[in-house]
UniProtKB/Swiss-Prot annotation:
Belongs to the terpene synthase family. Tpsd subfamily. The gene is TPS-ISO. The Asp-Xaa-Asp-Asp (DXDD) motif is important for the catalytic activity in the class II active site relevant for the cyclization of GGPP. The Asp-Asp-Xaa-Xaa-Asp/Glu (DDXXD/E) motif is important for the catalytic activity in the class I active site, presumably through binding to Mg(2+). The lineage of its organism: Eukaryota, Viridiplantae, Streptophyta, Embryophyta, Tracheophyta. One of its GO terms (biological process) is diterpenoid biosynthetic process. This is Bifunctional isopimaradiene synthase, chloroplastic. Mg(2+) 1 binds at residues 619, 623. Mg(2+) 3 binds at residues 763, 767, 771. Binds 3 Mg(2+) ions per subunit. It holds the Pfam family Terpene_synth_C. It catalyses: (2E,6E,10E)-geranylgeranyl diphosphate = (+)-copalyl diphosphate; (+)-copalyl diphosphate = isopimara-7,15-diene + diphosphate. One of its GO terms (cellular component) is chloroplast.
Length: 867
């Protein structure tokens, strides 16, 4: 550093002040000019020891500055250390980008394949009825048992008996051939053996089935309890008892069989018989295993409107054989009319299918192709929404937390009026959440869906906060248990899904990053566990995955071209000559491409990136580089929109102002084409408001003034620049925006205020220490501590986080309820708030992106294609 003569220290007042060439050192400007005239300094900062007014150093252009990350910290709010900031160089140099950029271009054949897949997936949505699923050998065996209603010695549904005879697997078992789950195979095989024995047919199949049972039953001991199908401990022992009566040669003395029988007896002992008939419970799903204790006249009162018992063909068949109830028979005929010669493990599955299909295409990032289809699916679900919750089917009398939480989250985000009070149905007296009313069963997938749901909370929804805490605890414990499995599904990578959800909850999960992650985790052959293993082809299939990969790579190739163009603009415009600011073109472009990624928003991404680049430059200019005189001149130039004023500006300001002037004029020309009216005055006004906020902060800094918390927030929510960025970019979202629409997202709107507030607060929580070390006196933490000198810094930081979390809940509500604002405009505001949460989740993810995970996000989003 260039040292000043200590004899001059007496001329400097006590305190800590930023000094400028013309304003703050008039008494010895000649001396300074003589020493550093070659450097043409424009900004100086004094540093002196604690409790002393002795000048130690003057830092200006041409002198050595402290690196950004090595800036001194001070314990005092009244006498911070001021140093000139020096930012780390940008990581994304051209050679780095070139080394990562894929040479693959989307071919005409791939584009044609995308069109075909889009058409086929649209047909999937349009053909959704009561649910598509695979055969259940177990349930089909129970339906095949039903004797002819005309009294003849034949099955009522002979086609189901024939299906059993024709669909035994090579190993002698029945069930899904591509996936072996011992519980499922043993249960289905036992059911088929008994049915064939009752009808005295299929001797060969019976023999092979018994052999399979004997050799494979012991494998159940090696499988996790969580893989035990629903109701297994009820129906399996009951069928074993029946098999023994029929004289079937089975290993009844196996240890696991004895254990299952003991579990059944213990469960039935705990079951008050009055509960069975008082209200619908999950026991209705397994009545075929409770035949010796059921009062059939009473149980009929709990029959669903569609004639089934909890949509289970097996349970309904058992009730029909005991009662002859016509509605049971009508239900079974209805199911067989759909599937022909077999039945699934439960049916219908209409709500489950629609919700999970929508969730799947959204998480894979291909939902922008299916907006109408998604709306139709959600309209259907909402028409069957119930304040007590929903189950997997519209006629299902028992709601479950899995379908309810999924429905609450998706419906809310799509603007449907649904209350979080619905989750109270699934909370016990200890505050824990469970899947079904009156039970304690929980699984990873249902708790994951509740957790995802809890993040779309509105202000004051304590049930959502409770759900978040409960499920986070459960899911973190599940991750620690390496042997943990989900109770309701066998998914490709449920662990990866949980890890992503916990690390990147809703407010920092950007669409492109979630798509990239879910493409890796998604299983096109995932199966679910009910009473038997079942598949949902409209939820898990290769078409979704194939389109997701093609679409991701196609969009990524477009983004790479746009980024190259922007980097060329950065250099050719002269902005690359500015040394006082951060070069973060790639990171800034990523912030846009991470959410407004669709091809039709290319201009919006371009404008968003350029305006964001300018907001960073202006922040650095007003924050530490420019003198108050020059900043005032710059602001006046923007206000008058007068290029002639650049002659009075320093060289770096000339570059900054000239490029801003030219770029904004170009944007305004394009904006006029898009909006059908002149928008230059509108854009200039947006910029003026930003510069006024920056100027106020520069004046605070010069005066060493620490404002009140509220005063700080009011100004800093503007100076964070997000409003400027959004209010200009929104002109290019493909919508003609009236003054009324603009007012709903304008400076006076709560929506925009919350975006600025949450962005400012998350920024401050991660940067206030470093900025305090550079001499900044105003941050949310410091201002709150000034008002509350009795609290610690940790307590102040906790308060700021609380304010931010509450504001994020309110932001959710504004995003969902602002239906008068076009979706693309609402997205722009909301996603800009979310990208701030992502960038500052670890620290200053813009300035220090090369040290943080942002670097990997940029790489995955913009450069690494999916295979």
């Amino acid at each position: 550093m260039a040292l000043l003569s200590s004899s001059l220290s007496s001329q400097i007042p006590t305190g800590s002040h930023p000094l400028t060439h013309t304003q703050c050192i008039p008494h010895f400007s000649t001396t300074i000019n003589a020493g550093i005239s070659a450097g043409k300094p424009r900004s100086f900062y004094l540093r002196w020891g604690k409790g002393s007014n002795k000048i130690i150093a003057c830092v200006g252009e041409g002198t050595t500055s402290l690196p950004y990350q090595s800036a001194e910290k001070t314990d005092s709010l009244s006498a911070p250390t001021l140093v000139k900031r020096e930012f780390p160089p940008g990581f994304w140099k051209d050679h780095v980008i070139d080394s990562l950029t894929s040479s693959h271009k989307v071919s005409a054949a791939e584009e044609k394949r995308m069109e075909t897949l889009i058409s086929e997936i649209k047909n999937i949505f349009r053909s959704m009825g009561y649910g598509e699923t695979n055969p259940s050998a177990y349930d089909t065996a129970w339906v095949a048992r039903i004797p002819a209603v005309d009294g003849s010695e034949h099955p009522e549904f002979p086609e189901t008996l024939e299906w059993i005879l024709q669909n035994q697997l090579k190993d002698g078992s029945w069930g899904e051939g591509f996936y072996f789950l011992a519980y499922d195979r043993i249960l289905a095989t036992l059911a088929c053996i008994i049915t064939l024995t009752l009808w005295r047919t299929g001797e060969t199949q019976i023999r092979k089935g018994i052999e399979f049972f004997k050799t494979q039953a012991g494998k159940i001991e090696d499988e996790a309890d969580s893989h035990r199908p629903s109701g297994f401990e009820i129906v399996f022992p009951a069928m074993l008892k029946e098999a023994k009566v029929l004289g079937l040669d089975l290993p009844y003395e196996l240890p696991f069989i004895k254990q299952i029988i003991e579990k059944r007896e213990a469960k039935l002992e705990r079951l008050p018989t009055n509960i069975l008939y008082a209200l619908p419970t999950t026991l209705l799903y397994s009545l075929e295993g409770l035949q010796e204790i059921v009062d059939w006249e009473k149980i009929i009162k709990l029959q669903s409107k569609d004639g089934s018992f909890l949509t289970s063909p097996a349970s309904t068949a058992a009730v029909f054989m005991r009662t002859g109830n016509k509605k049971c028979l009508e239900f079974l005929n209805f199911v067989l009319k759909k599937f022909g010669n077999h039945v699934p493990c439960h049916y219908p599955l209409d709500l489950f299918e629609r919700l999970w299909a929508v969730d799947t295409v959204e998480r894979l990032g291909i939902d922008h192709h299916f907006k109408e289809e998604i709306k139709d699916a959600l309209d259907y679900v909402y028409s069957h929404w119930d304040e007590r919750g929903i189950g997997w089917a519209r006629e299902n009398p028992i709601p479950d937390i899995d379908d309810t939480a999924m429905g609450l989250r998706i419906l809310r985000l799509h603007g449907y009026n649904v209350s979080s009070d619905v989750l109270k149905t699934f909370r016990d007296e200890n505050g824990e959440f469970f899947c079904f009313l009156g039970q304690t069963q929980r699984g990873v997938t249902d708790m994951l869906n509740v957790n995802r749901c809890s993040h779309v909370a509105f202000p004051g929804e304590t049930i959502m906060q409770e759900a978040k805490l409960c499920t986070e605890r459960y899911l973190r414990n599940a991750l620690e248990d390496v042997g943990a499995f989900d109770k309701w599904a066998l998914k490709k990578n449920i662990r990866g899904e949980v890890e992503y959800a916990l690390k990147y909850p809703w407010h920092r999960s950007m669409p492109r990053l979630e798509a990239r992650s879910y493409i890796e985790h998604y299983g096109p052959n995932d199966v679910w566990l009910g009473k038997t293993m079942y598949m949902m082809p409209y939820i898990s299939n290769l078409k979704y995955l194939e389109l997701a990969k093609l679409d991701f790579n196609h969009v990524q190739s477009l983004h790479q071209k746009e980024l190259r163009d922007l980097r060329r603009w950065w250099k050719s415009s002269g902005l690359s000559e500015l040394k006082f600011t951060r070069e973060r073109v790639t990171e800034i472009y990523f912030s846009a491409a991470s959410f407004i990624f669709e091809p039709e928003f290319a201009t919006c991404r371009d404008v968003y990136t350029k305006i964001s680049i300018f907001t960073v430059i202006l922040d650095d200019l007003y924050d530490a580089h420019g003198t108050l005189d020059n900043l005032e001149l710059f602001s006046e130039g923007v206000k008058r929109w007068d290029l002639s004023l650049v002659d009075r500006m320093p060289q770096d300001m000339k570059i900054c102002f000239t490029v801003l002037y030219n770029t904004v004029n170009e944007i305004a020309v394009e904006g006029r084409k898009r909006q059908g009216r002149d928008v230059l005055g509108y854009i200039r006004n947006v910029l003026e408001i930003l510069l006024a906020a920056h100027t106020k902060e520069a004046e605070w800094s010069a005066a060493r003034y620490v404002p009140s918390f509220d005063e700080y927030i009011e100004n800093a929510s503007v100076s964070i620049s997000l409003g400027t960025l959004v209010l200009i970019s929104v002109l290019f979202t493909g919508e003609i925006l009236t003054d009324d629409v603009l007012s709903k997202i304008g400076r006076g709107s709560r929506f925009l205020q919350l975006m600025g507030l949450t962005g400012r607060l998350v920024n401050d929580t991660k940067t206030y220490e470093a900025e305090r070390g550079q001499g900044e006196v105003a941050s949310a933490v410091q201002c709150y501590m000034k008002e509350h000198p009795e609290i610690s810094e940790e307590e102040a930081l906790k308060h700021v986080y609380t304010v931010m979390e509450n504001a994020l809940d309110e932001l959710n509500r504004e995003f969902v309820n602002n239906r008068d604002v076009p979706d693309s405009c609402r997205r722009l505001v909301f996603e800009t708030a979310r990208i701030m949460q992502l960038f500052y989740m670890e620290g200053d993810g813009l300035t220090l992106s090369h040290e943080m995970e942002i670097k990997e996000h940029v790489k995955n989003c913009l450069f690494q294609p999916v295979a």
